[in-house]
Amino acid sequence: MAKSSLAGADGALTWVNNAAKKEELETSNKNDSSKKLSVERVYQKKTQLEHILLRPDTYIGSVEPLTQLMWVYDEDVGMNCREVTFVPGLYKIFDEILVNAADNKQRDKNMTCIKVSIDPESNIISIWNNGKGIPVVEHKVEKVYVPALIFGQLLTSSNYDDDEKKVTGGRNGYGAKLCNIFSTKFTVETACKEYKHSFKQTWMNNMMKTSEAKIKHFDGEDYTCITFQPDLAKFKMEKLDKDIVALMTRRAYDLAGSCKGVKVMFNGKKLPVNGFRSYVDLYVKDKLDETGVALKVIHELANERWDVCLTLSEKGFQQISFVNSIATTKGGRHVDYVVDQVVGKLIEVVKKKNKAGVSVKPFQVKNHIWVFINCLIENPTFDSQTKENMTLQPKSFGSKCQLSEKFFKAASNCGIVESILNWVKFKAQTQLNKKCSSVKYSKIKGIPKLDDANDAGGKHSLECTLILTEGDSAKSLAVSGLGVIGRDRYGVFPLRGKILNVREASHKQIMENAEINNIIKIVGLQYKKSYDDAESLKTLRYGKIMIMTDQDQDGSHIKGLLINFIHHNWPSLLKHGFLEEFITPIVKASKNKQELSFYSIPEFDEWKKHIENQKAWKIKYYKGLGTSTAKEAKEYFADMERHRILFRYAGPEDDAAITLAFSKKKIDDRKEWLTNFMEDRRQRRLHGLPEQFLYGTATKHLTYNDFINKELILFSNSDNERSIPSLVDGFKPGQRKVLFTCFKRNDKREVKVAQLAGSVAEMSAYHHGEQALMMTIVNLAQNFVGSNNINLLQPIGQFGTRLHGGKDAASPRYIFTMLSSLARLLFPAVDDNLLKFLYDDNQRVEPEWYIPIIPMVLINGAEGIGTGWACKLPNYDAREIVNNVRRMLDGLDPHPMLPNYKNFKGTIQELGQNQYAVSGEIFVVDRNTVEITELPVRTWTQVYKEQVLEPMLNGTDKTPALISDYKEYHTDTTVKFVVKMTEEKLAQAEAAGLHKVFKLQTTLTCNSMVLFDHMGCLKKYETVQDILKEFFDLRLSYYGLRKEWLVGMLGAESTKLNNQARFILEKIQGKITIENRSKKDLIQMLVQRGYESDPVRAWKEAQEKAAEEEDTQNQHDDSSSDSGTPSGPDFNYILNMSLWSLTKEKVEELIKQRDTKGREVNDLKRKSPSDLWKEDLAAFVEELDKVEAQEREDILAGMSGKAIKGKVGKPKVKKLQLEETMPSPYGRRIVPEITAMKADASRKLLKKKKGDPDTPVVKVEFDEEFSGTPVEGTGEETLTPSAPVNKGPKPKREKKEPGTRVRKTPTSAGKPNAKKVKKRNPWSDDESKSESDLEETEPVVIPRDSLLRRAAAERPKYTFDFSEEEEEDADDDDDNNDLEELKVKASPITNDGEDEFVPSDGLDKDEYAFSPGKSKATPEKSSHDKKSQDFGNLFSFPSYSQKSEDDSAKFDSNEEDTASVFTPSFGLKQTDKVPSKTVAAKKGKPPSDTAPKAKRAPKQKKVVETVNSDSDSEFGIPKKTTTPKGKGRGAKKRKASGSENEGDYNPGRKPSKTASKKPKKTSFDQDSDVDIFPSDFTSEPPALPRTGRARKEVKYFAESDEEEDVDFAMFN
């Protein structure tokens, strides 16, 4: 039973097994069919060793053969770059062992040798190095010897501590192990003296089998040797071939060059490499650049970690670099780091030398560089184990490579720059050639306005001529003429103005210039093609170019530019007669049917001299081709022989002439060329010789040399005349024409600018565009800061502001202008009789120059670029110049002057000869706020905002944001930026210099003071004094001529009146009877009785003859009577008198006129030319005061609010937001710093002057609150110990004290700061600065006392009888004189100086007085000297120490224009009253100087009364000045540079002479209460008393609208 059970069980098992086998068989069949692997077979795990062998490219790179260009070392040719086939993996395992050997040098500086041995036959490579060996000791953790650990076990290394900064090549712990794994045999030998053992062990079969380590005792020198046999099968190689050996050899050389202090032996031989520089020679040896010169290598050892060599590359960018001895063949960040520096410097040089070429980008510069770099970098990183590309960021390099300027300079001279420039030229030429067609087309399209010749581009193309005309109108003329000669062989193309000077144009300009490209296309020219032979000429569409331009100087310039265009690109064409010109008459003279044509003005002038009866000829001027009619055009072309002038090439002198005229390199030669021309012209004029001219009747051809030297030079000279002003009047011709027209029109009402422009073109023969003329008019009227110091035209409308530098002017159609009242005072009408007027088109136009009373070229500056010369002169202060003129009239030398711009509040300091620093104004308001209240001259507000503040606010790619916000509070005349920044950044900015950070300093260089002198010759002036002296001599001589003219004219007038009076008296007495007598008898009777023929007419005719004026033909005969022939006696002036002349009143009037005229003549004879000049100056200064006072009033217009009655009847003025536009009174002024360079310039300047005491001290800034009195006579502004203002009690900031808010107003040397004198600075603080720098040993005193006033008032007004009818007006002249005198006396001397004056410590001994009283008290010489010296200062912002004490108190700091006519009604003792300007002017004497001066009271009295006073008390004292003594413009002056606390500037503080300080009284309209002033200046709550201040704040009540110049400084 059991058995059977068992048997059954066996059977069942058998069945199951069979079934399983069957199923397995089926499954197996299925698997075979689908080849499906098991999960275990799909997902496998390998050991790291297996993985390395299976995927070697992850570790050592590809194990496939690779063919590429590599630098290798071949025994026969040395280092060379060739195509090699190698296995990167094999190369890498060799390199790993090699780099390990080099790394040992970083561990042991005593290592000196590496031996490399390669045996290709036995496939054995050995690398040995001395130096510290591997420690032969057992690793306590891994329990194996260290050499076995690091060479036989993966992921072992000594480089895993990243906190340790290492400069080795090993990093990941793979290198040597990889070599072991890919070797059939790998043996390590090392000896360690420290552990006194040597170690040797061998691994085989790809590091799978290891022999026993052999450890022996050792006491020799340390070494390490690795010997291995690469598993060539793994690299699909059979043996070490030539290519891989050459590559390994190069690596041995690499080591020799990159491993400093290590000699490398290769196969037993020492490699001949001595350092990195020697290694580089292996590459560049015997290599030449494109010019055949050996490559020049620039080498610099920047530091111990960076060694750089640089040379020219002709194969694009190349680099050989090593990082810790690893050859980074693909470069990396270290290469970029060095190359970027080099490229940055080179591109600067290239751009300088390639301004006109193709723009060059950095990568293009890089393509010409070959750089060699050997560097040590801490813990470098790479993008793969192959270590070909270093990826570490430069900030982690552990060192910096700062290449020297010497290196960069050498780099720019080693051929790289030249190579880049050659490439640029090649690229430019390639681009230009694309513009040309190499195919000759008979028809071309796409060129508008071309009338092509029918035969152009065909077989007769060489016989075709292209006529290039000046504009469309000239084309019409040419087309009219083609009707005569036909269209088959002539084409016409109009030019749009002047073409480009291709010789100096940039590549971009040439590429984009449509005119040039069109000419090339029409003619069929090709760049770089030489047209030397007939065959090349046949490729052209036209065989000639005919130039047809106007016969004026601009037409000559167009001809010259076309000649230059052809000569520069295709010089050979000039030799083939390719160019010719078509000339037309410039003047035609016709008489009956006879007609003469003249082709040059000199030829016409010569004809006029020899022709009789010129008036019989009709003269017509042809200013352009458009003047000719179509009929005349046909006549011209019909006589082609006469009108076509061929250009002939005469030889090298032609090439030289063309180059001279148009090459940028010939600037100096052009100057000499033009100078010689001007001198020759001057000599010709002196000797009466005719001008040279080219186009005579026989002229058929012309050489290029003659064209350049006789025709084109006229344009160059006229270009200078149009661009460079005259020294005499400071005008360019266009400006002179405008003034001439305005004088001639003598408008009493304003006129539209556009209408005036048309009038100028009509009256003065202006031949250029009206738009330019209108801009000239606008510029003459502008008066914003940086434009004119004296605008000769009035800006009635929007003529532009400092916001946009005048570009915001309204259209000329909408704005009006008229002559300024100063114009005729600067250019007296009487001088017009002495001028030489020019003629244009037979029309009398403007004079050669006007002769102003002061050099206007200095007042308003000048700027212009001509041919060969350029001119640049800054503005100077008019009053300073007047002062210097007066000094010169008195026989003294003029004071030096600094540039000065009207209403500019910044500073201008001299740095050297004609070099100045111009600084704006900036104040620190609090810890995070600065306030910019002035910009450098001609830095326009909007431009500054966009180019400086916006980038500072938003930051740029290179610089982070510096400021956090800014606000604008400007007006059209003032600047105010309130800038917010963090406290830290403000501190940093202040440390660096706020002026520098905010770009508030510019330099002004005036080394091009080139002007036309009175002879019409260009002359360069070295100093402003030279200009002034030359002007002075000329002007003084003209005053002599004026006197002669006036004596003659007035004498003739006197004789005329005398004869008339005598005739009337004799008639009344019955001695003469005229009734019923013939005219002939009357004339004979008058002759017999000794009456003279019209003396005025006779004198005029004598003048004309004496002057030998060429325009006599233009003078019509004034003889309108038949009393006699023109040559006979003329008694019309007697016989034409009316019967009214016989009345008693008229007789008395006539006798009075006669006597008055006689006195005028006698007075004039007694005066010297100097006296006449002084009279003119006095009148000018007087009017200047009025004009500037009016300007201030206009600026303040509308700023006052309406008075509103309060509860107690006190008018309260609606407070306006003025404070936001005014500088903060709490700011700390920052003094501009002089840079080291500027300071050096200053020192040189002072040394040059050899310690001359008169030498001004160059100061960067003049402290506003500078209250010390400059030491008199030193020229330096020094604080003297006696300056009581600094030490005395400080008055409280007076609330709402108009006019005392001072912008930085430097004081002038030699002037007390405290006195609030008649502050005459219309210009601005910088004027005072300039003057203070100018001061010499004597303080300059402006003679503006009452004597001067009287001189101005009594300035005679001469009247002349220019017509018979003038007799009746003679009486009016005297009346006018009286009125004028009254006017002058009555008009107060208004203070135009907006700037506050610095408080004065005291009055100079010759303080300037406007009254004779003070003058008398002053010694004559002292008075004279000082007056002269400080004349400019009187009118400049500095306070005037030269005024009398009384006068000094006359003017409020800023309200001076009209404040002076009112007297303070409060807080003044009677003794404090100050005479007004009016009184001084009328009476000529102020209160005695000895009048007791009120002492400064401990407290100011009646403050409240004064403020509340609504009475007319302010008018109680007849027109006395309102400014209390000591309250100068500086009274409320802002603190400068924080040198003293805000109370230090003591407006009320007077030196010992002035013991009292009167409260400043401002005269304002009752409607404008002091509240209109910013609270900054008037702190609402009364200021707390400060130490030393004894007075309470004074509130002022405004009395008059006129007096609103509250605080004029804030507007200027």
Swiss-Prot record:
Q: What is an annotated GO biological process for this record, any one? A: DNA topological change
Location of Phosphotyrosine modifications: 1358, 1408, 1596
What is the top EC class of this enzyme, as a single word? Answer: isomerase
Q: Where in the cell is it found?
A: Nucleus, Nucleolus; Nucleus, Nucleoplasm; Nucleus
Chain positions found as Phosphoserine: 1224, 1324, 1328, 1330, 1332, 1346, 1363, 1387, 1400, 1411, 1428, 1439, 1441, 1448, 1453, 1460, 1509, 1511, 1513, 1537, 1539, 1563, 1568, 1600
Task: Identify the residues that the record assigns to the Topo IIA-type catalytic domain, covering every copy.
Answer: 724-1177
User: For ATP, which residues are the binding ones?
Assistant: 100, 129, 157-159, 170-177, 385-387
Q: What superkingdom heads the lineage?
A: Eukaryota
Note how many cofactor molecules are bound and how. Binds two Mg(2+) per subunit. The magnesium ions form salt bridges with both the protein and the DNA. Can also accept other divalent metal cations, such as Mn(2+) or Ca(2+).
Q: Which residues form the Toprim domain?
A: 464-581
- Biased composition of type Acidic residues is found at 1362-1379
Q: Which annotated residues bind Mg(2+) 2?
A: 550, 552
The protein depicted here goes by the name: DNA topoisomerase 2-beta
- This chain's source organism reads Cricetulus longicaudatus (Long-tailed dwarf hamster)
Gene encoding the protein? TOP2B
